[in-house]
């Protein structure tokens, strides 16, 4: 009974803002940062 409650609580807390909140934004931030960096560098070169 306690295990079921913990599992439900962990599952709700994990995918709510722990699992999809940390690995997803981390992976997306890395890809977006890399893309943004390349775009910014290109933009700076073009502006110059």
From Swiss-Prot:
- Sequence segments annotated as region (Disordered): 1-48
Q: Where is the composition biased (Basic and acidic residues)?
A: 1-12
Q: Where is the composition biased (Basic residues)?
A: 30-48
Gene Ontology biological process terms, A to Z: asexual sporulation; sporulation resulting in formation of a cellular spore
What the entry lists under Pfam families is as follows:
SspP
Q: What induces it?
A: Expressed only in the forespore compartment of sporulating cells.
Q: What is its main location?
A: other
Q: Which InterPro entries match?
A: SASP_SspP
Q: Where in the cell is it found?
A: Spore core
Mind listing the UniProt keywords for this protein, alphabetically? Sporulation
The family note in this entry says: Belongs to the SspP family.
Identify this protein by name: Small, acid-soluble spore protein P
């Amino acid at each position: 009974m306690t295990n079921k409650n913990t599992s439900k609580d962990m599952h709700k807390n994990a995918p709510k803002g722990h699992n999809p909140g940390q690995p997803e934004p981390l992976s997306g931030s890395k890809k977006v940062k890399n893309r943004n960096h390349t775009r910014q560098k290109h933009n700076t070169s073009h502006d110059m």
